[in-house]
């Protein structure tokens, strides 16, 4: 019996539903006999051949293009057969079933044409590409990220990762760590030599440069992770502060009902927008007030869901009504809401209705301009006239830590950020040991090894089976 990752696999590679074209993909070793049975003739490598796809009796299931990519010059690194038919789900299912049937039939040589052919698991074609060194792990993840990209910037960043930009930078850092570790090991292995390998190699300077490059790569990875994951933003505040109007202004569409009646919004409403290519998932919530003030049970449930959304948010836009901020009770309620927010949430105070209270708006704007470093960000705007909306967009990106031009960013995942952070921690520790006497060289070497291993996890040079299963299990079937 073949190992699982050597078994031939087949799947419909195009998305479910109706379309002009659908693709059935087969990957394995030795597909010539299967291809001949399906199309009735030998296929020339890497040349599209048009004709019928045949059932067991020789009748046509459909007509389309067949392509054979012999190993190793294919997506998976194995022999690959692609059948491009009309994109109806029934046709594609019939074609896939015929592939499985024909694989088990006895060929002219007296043996099954492709024994063991089975349906592919999600992501298994890309997993084969990784296992056969066609892609590293970061590139394999970029395939899924390119498919899932929700903005143009995210798609272009994923394409850069798929082309190997991210991996090349990781490899360059790993090579530097290996070279420096070799010098440390040489000093440990040949203590009798009158050569200070580390001093001659400028170990301190190398470590400083490695730390600097790691810091830059970590910052870029954070930008890439933000492009991939997006920013989850909750609009919160008291009833009638203008939350739904702000959602409409940010989205550029009338998504939420706006009335002067308190409690109009009973449940959360969400919309994904783009700000400089960054996906921002904006959630409008029910107005926050005490259970005693809530009009009925439905509103109380809506308020509870608002707090739940806040707990899961990356940032909160806390709305203040400029026409009522001078009222002690209203101001006290705003303060109570702010104090209840999670300590680690990105908070932006949004002072709304500047068009209705221009003098108060000017006073608040002056106060915000004089705020100290570390104070929560604040914006004065009018959701009705859209004045100040651009400033709010900029404040949101700044709060999220976005400062890069999308053209220079590669897509990244949270696990990449964690690995880079771990590597940076180990390099910092190595710098500390390098300042010590020669008795600390073994500890220096260990920190360099740990930093290298952390980076190796990104490209898959060192990966656990559990990690691989989690990554490829998130792909669609047929990819």
UniProtKB/Swiss-Prot annotation:
Q: Give UniProt keywords alphabetically.
A: Cytoplasm, GTP-binding, Hydrolase, Magnesium, Metal-binding, Nucleotide-binding, Potassium, tRNA processing
Q: Where does Mg(2+) bind?
A: 244, 265
EC assignment: 3.6.-.-
Q: How is its cofactor bound, per UniProt?
A: Binds 1 potassium ion per subunit.
Where is it localised?
A: Cytoplasm
Gene3D superfamilies referenced in this protein's UniProt entry, alphabetically = P-loop containing nucleotide triphosphate hydrolases (3.40.50.300), Probable tRNA modification gtpase trme, domain 1 (3.30.1360.120), tRNA modification GTPase MnmE domain 2 (1.20.120.430)
**Positions annotated to bind K(+):** 240, 259, 261, 264
Superkingdom to which the source organism belongs: Bacteria
GO process terms (BP):
tRNA methylation; tRNA wobble uridine modification
The family assignment reads:
Belongs to the TRAFAC class TrmE-Era-EngA-EngB-Septin-like GTPase superfamily. TrmE GTPase family.
Q: What does this protein do?
A: Exhibits a very high intrinsic GTPase hydrolysis rate. Involved in the addition of a carboxymethylaminomethyl (cmnm) group at the wobble position (U34) of certain tRNAs, forming tRNA-cmnm(5)s(2)U34.
Q: What is this protein called?
A: tRNA modification GTPase MnmE
Q: What is the lineage of its organism?
A: Bacteria, Pseudomonadati, Pseudomonadota, Betaproteobacteria, Burkholderiales
Its encoding gene is what? mnmE
């Amino acid at each position: 019996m073949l190992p699982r990752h050597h078994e031939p696999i087949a799947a419909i590679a195009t998305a479910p539903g109706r379309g002009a074209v659908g693709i059935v993909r087969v990957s394995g070793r030795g597909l010539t006999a299967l291809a001949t049975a399906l199309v009735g003739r030998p296929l020339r490598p890497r040349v599209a051949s048009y004709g019928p796809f045949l059932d067991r009796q020789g009748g046509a299931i459909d007509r389309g293009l067949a392509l054979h990519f012999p190993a190793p010059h294919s997506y998976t690194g194995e022999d690959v057969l692609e059948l491009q038919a009309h994109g109806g789900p029934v046709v594609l299912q019939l074609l896939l079933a015929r592939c499985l049937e024909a694989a088990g039939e006895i060929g002219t040589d007296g043996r099954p044409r492709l024994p063991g052919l089975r349906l592919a698991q999600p992501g298994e074609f890309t997993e084969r590409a990784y296992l056969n060194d066609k892609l590293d792990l970061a590139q394999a993840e970029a395939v899924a990220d390119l498919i899932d990209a929700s903005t143009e910037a995210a798609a272009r960043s994923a394409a850069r990762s798929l082309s190997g930009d991210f991996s090349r930078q990781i490899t360059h850092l790993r090579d530097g760590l290996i070279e420096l570790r070799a010098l440390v090991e040489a000093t440990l292995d040949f203590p009798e030599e009158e050569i200070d390998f580390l001093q001659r190699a400028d170990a301190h300077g190398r470590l400083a440069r490695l730390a600097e490059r790691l810091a830059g790569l970590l910052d870029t990875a954070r930008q890439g992770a933000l492009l991939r994951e997006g920013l989850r933003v909750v609009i919160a505040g008291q009833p009638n502060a203008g939350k739904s109007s702000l959602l409409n202004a940010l989205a550029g569409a009338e998504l939420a009902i706006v009335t002067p009646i308190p409690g109009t919004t009973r449940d959360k409403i969400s919309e994904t927008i783009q700000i400089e290519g960054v996906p921002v998932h904006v959630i409008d919530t029910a107005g926050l007030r005490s259970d005693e003030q809530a009009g009925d049970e439905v509103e109380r449930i809506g308020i509870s869901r608002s707090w739940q959304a806040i707990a899961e948010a990356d940032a909160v836009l806390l709305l203040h009504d400029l026409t009522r901020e001078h009222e002690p009770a209203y101001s006290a309620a705003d303060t109570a809401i702010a104090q209840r927010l999670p300590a680690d949430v990105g908070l932006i105070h949004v002072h709304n209705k500047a068009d209705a209270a221009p003098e108060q708006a000017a006073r608040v704007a002056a106060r915000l301009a004089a705020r100290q470093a570390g104070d929560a960000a604040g914006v004065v705007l009018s959701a009705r006239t859209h004045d100040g909306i651009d400033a709010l967009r900029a404040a949101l990106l700044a709060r999220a830590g976005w400062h890069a031009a999308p053209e220079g960013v590669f897509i990244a995942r949270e696990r990449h950020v964690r690995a880079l952070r771990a590597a940076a921690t180990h390099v910092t520790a190595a710098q500390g040991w390098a300042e010590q006497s020669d008795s600390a060289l073994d500890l220096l070497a260990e920190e360099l090894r740990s930093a290298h291993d952390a980076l190796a996890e990104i490209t898959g040079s060192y990966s656990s089976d559990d990690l691989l299963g989690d990554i490829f299990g998130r792909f669609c079937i047929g990819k």
